[in-house]
Amino acid sequence: MSDTRISIRYASEDLRERAEALAAELNLPLAGESAGTPLVLILDGHGLSLALTAPDAPGPIQVDFVTGRLGYRQARISLRSEPLARAVGIKDSERPSVVDATAGLGRDGFVLASLGCEVTLLEREPVIAALLADGLERAARDADLAQTIARMHLVTGNARDWLTALDEAPRPDVIYLDPMYPHRDKSALVKKEMRVFRTLVGDDQDAPETLEAALAVAKRRVVVKRPARAEPLSGRKPSHQIPGKTTRFDVYVTG
């Protein structure tokens, strides 16, 4: 059954074939073949983006590792400046393998890959995964980012199921979780993205179960991103915490 909330729109006739292939892959209608939908995937010369269609809707969101905030940040990433690096246990001579079990738009995975980690990105919502795949493909063509992007490996599927099915041999050193929660960040970008995301996926109601699956699999630690003043996920006390202004990282040492 197709998702009646989303349709696909293409900007020019030369993109029609690609749009039709994407529609078939995601089981979504093209915009002209359905009634108005709350969300629309837009395929144009800049890549793939996702937008709400309401009259008061913010602009579209797109995964862009090359320019904008992520491109600026990538040039300035360092071990000392990244609390995430400390949370996952990156050291001068050590780069753990990481599974980002809630990949979303790939920002935290990109930071970890920029610091030298091999990162498996798990995203269960196929539309978000399509946005991420498009961003990775475009970034891989940038000479300055090619090595970083090569360390990012996207898997579309449910994180809990994927973790439960792992064999003993390829267990990751670290599993990272950033469950969907109401952000306190009031920036226009965060508000725009959260509005689109909540329309599409809502909150991560199964985050406690995913945490349990992660704790059973991670060789070294599980890291959970939380609002600074929130209770630990599932009330489970972490081994230690890395605090920040609006968020913190709860670290669960497993080995």
Curated annotation (Swiss-Prot):
Q: Which GO terms describe its molecular function?
A: rRNA (guanine-N2-)-methyltransferase activity
Positions of transmembrane segments? none
Task: Tell me, in one coarse class, where this protein mainly resides.
Answer: cytoplasm
| Gene Ontology CC terms, in alphabetical order | cytoplasm
The UniProt keyword set, sorted, is:
Cytoplasm, Methyltransferase, rRNA processing, S-adenosyl-L-methionine, Transferase
Is Methyltransferase set as a keyword in this record? yes
Could you tell me where this protein is found in the cell?
A: Cytoplasm
The UniProt entry, under SUPFAM superfamilies, shows: S-adenosyl-L-methionine-dependent methyltransferases (SSF53335)
Identify one Pfam family in the record: SAM_MT
Quote the record's binding site residues for S-adenosyl-L-methionine.
Answer: R107, D108, E123, R124, D178
Q: Does the keyword Cytoplasm apply?
A: yes
Q: Do you know which InterPro entries this protein is assigned to?
A: 16SrRNA_methylTrfase_J, SAM-dependent_MTases_sf
Which stretches does the entry tag as region Disordered?
A: 228-247
Which reaction does this enzyme catalyse, per its entry? guanosine(1516) in 16S rRNA + S-adenosyl-L-methionine = N(2)-methylguanosine(1516) in 16S rRNA + S-adenosyl-L-homocysteine + H(+)
Q: What is its EC number?
A: 2.1.1.242
Q: Which domain of life is it from?
A: Bacteria
The entry's family comment says: Belongs to the methyltransferase superfamily. RsmJ family.
**What does the UniProt function comment say about this protein?**
Specifically methylates the guanosine in position 1516 of 16S rRNA.
Q: What is this protein called?
A: Ribosomal RNA small subunit methyltransferase J
